[in-house]
Amino acid sequence: IGIKAKIHLKLDTGMSRLGYVVLDDKVEEIAAEIKEISELEGIILEGMYTHFATADARNKEFENLQTHRFSEMVEKIKDMGVEIDYIHCSNSAEILDCDEKYDMVRPGIIQYGVYPSNEVNYSIDIKPVMAFKAKVSNVKILDAGTSISYGRVYFTTVREKIVSIAAGYADGFLRGRRNPYVYINGVKCSIVGRICMDQSMVRVPMDMDVKVNDDVLVFGDDLVSVDDVARDCDSIAHEVMCMMSRRVPRVYYRHGEIVSIVDYL
């Protein structure tokens, strides 16, 4: 149809996931093949990139090897007269830790104000921009010996005030946490019984003034960070944030005021 596709060619320098596998003893051969690709009539080779396997680790030995492989290929291809506008390799961790940024960067989790790991450079001050909140859906007083939720794995030992919250595993409130808790009215409160698909039950102090529609903080500020949640379920912040489903409305703020609410359902 007379339209050329602009492409970015990926080099696999050690991630072993996707891309054109770069072998140390075949640099010339690989570069020649990429030159042939750049000359195909239907495409424009606009960019070339790689991805690091250990960018968020303190030990940079393997990352340095990947960087060497990538830069060697870039130089070899340029020497063959192939002009590429955008060379890029920096994810969030690489942006924080390394000086070589090439023509573009690919920030991911740092756009949400979260560090990729506890082994990266913390000298850049970033602030979390995302919180996961729910609402209280029910408040009840239960007598001692009452079972709660599926499987009856939790029984009240005394009279307890139990709050149901409108958040469950279908929303991204992970069932795999070892010691799940939330904050209600600034008070840390434990989840009791198994987390359900749409609801979860929370034990609150008997004297707490709590009512339906009160806010519940799952994660998102100094009280409980996404990293706290990730550690509690042997995961990483990336996974915890990605698990928040489309069932949860997105509320956008600017200068403390709601500017948009997006509900995908």
Whereabouts are the PLM-identified features?
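Internal, well-ordered alpha-helical scaffold/interface segments
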Residues: A134-S137, V163
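C-terminal accessory subdomain/extension
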Residues: I141-L265
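Active-site loop/helix belt of alpha/beta enzymes
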Residues: I3-K6, T13-K135, L142-D143, I261
